[in-house]
Amino acid sequence: KIAILGNLLPLWDDPLWLAEQIAMMDMISGGRIVSGWVRGGGRESVSHNSNPTINWDRYQEAHDFVVKAWTTPGPFRWEGKYLHYRYVNPWALPYQKPHPPIWIPGAASRATVKWASEHRYPYVMIGGDLALTRISFDYYKEVASENGYQSSTQHVGKLVKVHVEDTDEKGDQVGRKYLSGVSNPFLDGNEGIVNLSIQNLPGLSPRGGNARMPVAASLAAGRGGVGRQSYEAQVQHYSIISAGPKKVIAGMRHVLEYLRPGSMFFWDGDGSMTHDDQMRSLRLMGQEVLPAIREVGKELGLVGPYEVPGEVTGTYLPK
């Protein structure tokens, strides 16, 4: 599969173009595309001169429009609050029917978890430690129950920074490169720490005690968060797993046992890692780690969306 996690829906002035691009990739690849939708953070809003106060509303309308463009024979007209098309008749339609699978990455926003669960879209936690991720998954399950279905492993996924080396010592040495790298205008120094005043623009996210998961809210209040923790702390919390194959497999087993996600995503080759660092890890990942993790998943009874009939594309269609 080719998972795009994900496109920044609220920032597209012409989401019809986006719908056709993804449809074309789905045709060319023979139905391999997984389409992820994200809202983006404050940095993206600043870069694209986008109003953060309407980000969430634009996200939802753009999503409904793209799904309709994929599933409704044209021509049709769309007159929404933010999007206006007199004539919609896509020349490219997805290979997969009714549309490519939609997965929703998120980082502790209650609104995003709730919305994903209401639409029965798999939710992929891309930030936060294991405790915060479990709280998010439990909330997804709670919302699913309120909407008439029981969520399971196929509805949740987790992104973890994973790097593999021949030895644990080498893994520890290279893994520290996650916390360094080239600077950019939106980071404090060159240690990859997001400037909170840019990331959390006024109006971008709902305010109040229920806007974020409890652990995330407490971290934000203390200017904490995984990105501001030391390397040792992130390793302790399983936000980074960087070691030899056996230790990486053991760490991933703990993650799988604790969270029970049906899908896992590995974040490698970041920070100041070199091309050689990435290629060594990629080789060991494919030869030793992934086969072992798949067996652990089978042992724990973890299934992904593609292993459950009817769960691939979800059940949502726009009205």
Feature map (PLM): residue ranges:
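Alpha-helix-loop-beta-strand connector modules within alpha/beta enzyme cores
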Residues: 1-4, 58, 283-297
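Short, acidic/polar
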Residues: 18-21, 106-114, 247-255
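Flexible loop/turn segments at secondary-structure boundaries
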Residues: 10-12, 43-44, 112, 131-133, ...
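Flexible, glycine-rich active-site loops centered on histidine and acidic residues
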Residues: 9-78, 122-125, 129-131, 138, ...
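Active-site mouth loops of central-metabolism enzymes
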Residues: 5-16, 98-108, 162-165, 235-246
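Conserved, mostly hydrophobic/aromatic
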Residues: 25, 66, 102, 116, ...
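Hydrophobic faces of well-ordered beta-strands that scaffold small-molecule active sites
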Residues: 2-6, 33-37, 102-105, 123-126, ...
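An alpha-helical appendage that flanks or caps ligand/catalytic pockets
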Residues: 53-93, 131-261, 294-319
